[in-house]
Amino acid sequence: YQYIEPKNQAVVSIQQIDASEFPTVKLYMSIKDKTTGNVIENLDDAFFYINKQDANAKYVKQVVKSANQLNEKEALKVDMVADVSGSMDGSPLNEAKQVMSDFIGSVQFDAGDLVELTSFSTGVCLEQEFSDDAATLTNDINNLVTGDMTSLYDALYTAVERVAAQNGARCVIAFTDGNDNYSNCTKEDVVNVANRYHVPVFIIVIGSIDYADVNDIATQTGGMYYNVSDVTSMD
């Protein structure tokens, strides 16, 4: 396929490619105004075309069947990763639980969204497989308890691999208050596997930590990082 730089004031990037229903291929794209950084809305299939290279190395224009804004038309698969290391004990974990529960309340389960809950401390634990049951997920969140060390990179790596096996749009959202101190994986391992599967990683940081590593992971995988104090809505 051939990528052509847009002629207007738009910043276009391909986030994910889903070929699970080949020959139908879905592209998930970020399209933002170059000046304001805001998402450009009200775009339909007439705004897009794709050139595919044929057996003779010539590019042939392909039909774009439809173009829809993700949060309106397409199911989303999310692996939600919760830090339950010792430093999260007390108010940090309670704050994270509140934001995670708020997020569950905003998920469009009736549209096909699925959420998986993964926790980590000294090790990585699958708390709940991909589910559309908001009550069960909220209960699992409320039952989280703290452990000891911080295996952040191992948890992110595991979450990326698991959500990558799902079809459609996918991402990882992690909540953490500290730097990794116990993983076998490295930051680079997380970035590489996320980019291999085109899975963006979003990180919500709790408290004052060294933002450099989490910023690298988020920005290098097409995600973003936020401080929990700035997060009022996850929808």
Segments (PLM) and residue ranges:
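C-terminal "exit" segments of structured domains
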Residues: 1-10, 16-25, 219, 226-235
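Exposed beta-strand and adjacent loop surfaces of beta-rich binding modules
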Residues: 9, 26, 45-47, 114, ...
